[in-house]
């Protein structure tokens, strides 16, 4: 999660750690000083705290994000509210630009208002600030958060900032009172997987123009219900993209990914076979985190949604020259995009989540964030990941695939709560 438009670190020169692996603390006092995701230099994530006095929390903070969430250690809170937005399913006019070596951000235009609703947890005055998606140095490990040590190729962040115009002080969450002060931000994190089937052909330039203006097919991803009979009118309908029974794993018996859904990326003999990371007994297999008896299986009512509209929006945006080509601060060209932020989320009935008090994941690493990390995953087209990794983040044309845009896991002892048993 980010908040500021930073200078590009290359404009300030590059420093390297000394023989003892130590970087000198600079006297810089800018909160928008340049930083990098290159882990070999002093501008990289392990040394962000040395770049500016404003960044000191990156090195000594007690509630730094992201973290590895251990599901069985998370504490169930019965009264945690459902995650909703006001207004519901609102289509916003946003602008996205090249964000240099950071994830491109979709920011609402003036007058576009969307608020997150987490009744009894925070007040109702957290206003949508941006949507961005993180990627990694490898295709498989791109999410900033992990659950039980497992990552996904991408992680979407919906950032909400307390609206100063309301004249209310940000309310502190009632989650044990471990930290003093207020939470200025609410950030919703969503694990994004990638797939090949069910997302249609690659859109051409003319189709992208229509898509970015908000023109989509008549059928709605959330149309006649999450299990509707008409496929695309329900995320995983009986005759739809995800097979007869959908619920038997990621995509059901006759779905896109083989006989038993989530037994590997593409069925029983997927990327890691029956007993691999995604196999029958692995993270996403029958008894794993996302399998029939696991965290995302029958017992807890979770299912991976194919976010088809979002996929085409992201793919078209990341491919557009205004976003893809490197731009210095002040020279950006904004691309207008009509976007419904809820497209990035699971359907309402599957918005089970983990929550904890953490920080921004980019400098200045401000420790005033309430994180709401979705348990259920969303799937986008593999072309989205390819397009994002091909966005230029550096003056020499180096793309985001080289260093990624994910901060390494932070070793904090923070209490994580969950809205589900």
UniProtKB/Swiss-Prot annotation:
Entries under InterPro entries matching the protein: Alpha_CA_prokaryot-like, CA_dom, CA_dom_sf, Carbonic_anhydrase_a-class, Collagen
Entry comment describing in which tissues the protein is expressed: Expressed in the mantle.
PROSITE patterns recorded: ALPHA_CA_2
Residue segments, region Disordered: 197-303
Misc. remarks from the entry: Two hypotheses for calcium binding are proposed. Either the Gly-Xaa-Asn repeat domain bind calcium or sulfite and sialic acid provide the necessary negative charge in the N-glycan to promote calcium uptake.
Region of interest: 24 X 3 AA approximate tandem repeats of G-X-N: 225-296
Organism of derivation: Pinctada maxima
Function: Acts as a negative regulator for calcification in the shells of mollusks. May function both as a calcium concentrator and as a carbonic anhydrase required for production of carbonate ions, which are assembled to CaCO(3) at mineralization sites. Is important for shell formation in both the calcitic prismatic layer and the aragonitic nacreous layerr. Shows inhibitory activity of crystal formation when present in free state but, when attached to the insoluble matrix, may regulate the form and size of aragonite crystal.
Main location class: secreted
Protein's name in the database: Nacrein-like protein M
Segments of skewed composition (Acidic residues): 197-206
Domain Alpha-carbonic anhydrase stretches: 33-420
Positions contributing to Zn(2+) binding: 132, 134, 157
Catalysed conversion reaction: hydrogencarbonate + H(+) = CO2 + H2O
UniProt KW Repeat keyword: yes
EC number(s) recorded for this UniProt protein: 4.2.1.1
Keyword match Transmembrane helix: no
């Amino acid at each position: 999660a980010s908040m500021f438009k930073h200078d590009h670190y290359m404009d300030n020169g590059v420093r390297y750690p000394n023989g003892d692996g130590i970087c000198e603390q600079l006297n810089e006092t800018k909160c928008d000083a340049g930083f990098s995701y290159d882990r070999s230099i002093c501008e990289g994530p392990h040394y962000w705290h040395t770049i500016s006095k404003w960044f000191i929390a990156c090195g000594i903070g007690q509630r730094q994000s992201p973290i590895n969430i251990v599901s069985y250690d998370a504490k169930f809170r019965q009264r945690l509210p459902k995650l909703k937005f006001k207004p519901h399913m609102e289509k916003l006019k946003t602008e996205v630009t090249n964000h240099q070596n950071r994830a491109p951000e979709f920011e609402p235009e003036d007058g576009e208002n969307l608020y997150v609703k987490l009744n009894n947890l925070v007040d109702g005055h957290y206003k949508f600030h941006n949507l961005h998606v993180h990627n990694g140095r490898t295709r498989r490990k791109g999410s900033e958060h992990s659950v039980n040590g497992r990552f996904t190729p991408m992680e979407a962040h919906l950032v909400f900032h307390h609206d100063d115009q309301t004249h209310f002080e940000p309310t502190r969450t009632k989650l044990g009172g471990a930290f003093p002060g207020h939470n200025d931000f609410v950030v919703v994190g969503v694990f994004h997987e990638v797939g090949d089937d069910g997302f249609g052909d690659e859109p051409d330039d003319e189709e992208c123009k229509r898509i970015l203006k908000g023109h989509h097919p008549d059928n709605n991803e959330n149309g006649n219900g999450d299990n509707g009979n008409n496929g695309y009118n329900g995320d995983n309908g009986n005759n739809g993209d995800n097979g007869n029974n959908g619920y038997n794993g990621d995509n059901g018996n006759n779905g896109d990914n083989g006989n038993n859904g989530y037994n590997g990326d593409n069925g029983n003999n997927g990327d890691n076979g029956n007993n691999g990371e995604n196999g029958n007994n692995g993270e996403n297999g029958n008894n794993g985190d996302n399998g029939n008896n696991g965290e995302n299986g029958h017992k807890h009512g979770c299912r991976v949604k194919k976010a088809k509209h979002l996929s085409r929006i992201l793919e078209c945006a990341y491919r557009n020259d205004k976003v893809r080509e490197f731009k210095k601060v002040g020279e950006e060209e904004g691309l207008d995009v009509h976007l419904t932020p809820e497209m990035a989320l699971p359907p309402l009935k599957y918005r089970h989540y983990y929550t904890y008090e953490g920080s921004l994941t980019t400098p200045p690493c401000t420790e005033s964030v309430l994180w709401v990390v979705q348990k259920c995953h969303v799937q986008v087209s593999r072309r989205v990941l390819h397009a994002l990794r091909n966005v230029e983040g550096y003056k020499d044309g180096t793309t985001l695939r080289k260093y990624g845009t994910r901060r390494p896991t932070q070793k904090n002892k923070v209490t994580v709560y969950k809205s589900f048993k």
